[in-house]
Amino acid sequence: MKLEQFDFKYMPALVERVYNLWTPPQAEEKFRWIYAESIIRQDMHANNMQFQLTENGQIMAIACASRKGEKNSAGPWWNEQFSKLSDEQKISFNMGREYIAYMDKKTFAFMNENDVKLDMFISTKKGWRKKLLDKAISFFKQAGFENLFLWTDEECNVDWYINHNYELVNEDIYELFSSEEDYKTYVFKMKLE
């Protein structure tokens, strides 16, 4: 099992994994596919921390990370997709982009130059998330990073982070996604010792 740089040939398998979790259920299928892919791409950067684990030619897990202030590499792809959407779809597509940018900026505000941000991790099979995170964390330590940061929201298993040595550094409400209920967001930190 070797930690490798992400190969985009595995993008369809990742989109398929998150399709029902990360997309507006009432939207048409083609838009949902593009929307899910846009979330993944907006968490990728042009650096050496876009990791994958594969087994027998299949993607098992990916993790993408960035340094403080790094911008994602989705721009050209995102703009091309955006230009093909209806006006209503553009609003939804842009809301997703703005949310990710907002949470990235918020997380960067807690970071120093020797910290790393885990932008995303996806596993396609049970047990592979831990395998990948262990390898990625080892890489981050060897690279000299001091702390690992990540953000998440109420749609994820927030208790998992608390139970795995992550410190909650910020809990907030994202007003644009709130209705009768507040939409909660979280920023976590883990010391890389």
List where the protein language model places each region.
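A short beta-loop-alpha structural element at the N-terminal edge
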Residues: 1-16, 28
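Active-site rim helix/loop that mediates acceptor-substrate recognition in acyltransferases
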Residues: 27-56, 64-70
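Short hydrophobic/aromatic beta-strand element in the GNAT-like acyltransferase core
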Residues: 48-52, 62, 120, 185-187
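Conserved acyl-donor/pantetheine-binding loop and adjacent beta-alpha core of acyl/acetyltransferases
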Residues: 64-120, 176-181
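Conserved GNAT acetyl-CoA-binding A-motif
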Residues: 112-117, 140-153
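Conserved beta-strand-loop-alpha-helix junction that forms the acyl-donor binding cleft
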Residues: 118-125, 149-159, 174-179
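Conserved acetyl-CoA-binding loop-helix of GNAT-fold acetyltransferases
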Residues: 124-140, 163
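Conserved acetyl-CoA-binding loop of GNAT-fold acetyltransferases
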Residues: 162-171
